Amino acid sequence: KKLLFVDDSIVRGTQLRETVEFLYESGAEEVHMRSACPPIMYGCKYLNFSRSNSDMELLARKTVQELEGDEGQAHLDEYADASTERGRCMLRSICEKLGFDSLGYQSLDGLLEAIGIDRDKICTYCWSGAE
């Protein structure tokens, strides 16, 4: 069976690893993952949404650090964009880590369009770092 698993967000990825293992043990041949929001690159400084003590606990940021070290932190916007080489590289790395056959994130523009709220009326800090 080929499965498409959709989640509202991927924060640290710890629960997904166990879920993917369970799906394969239960007979899945492929597990494809889609996130309804963009990669979380920054811990929430307003509501503590991500419950992370450090940005490096966030799966996307941790992956960037593993791929490129401190140099990668200057290119977070590229990593958050699946149409760039850095973005594709991050997706491949997360797939390998968590056992996905494919991974896709909603873009920030796509998210804003889907919810119908103007960019200037919603906080996007955890995705873009913009205050």
Task: List each language-model region with its residue ranges.
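PRPP-associated nucleotide enzymes
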Residues: 1-131
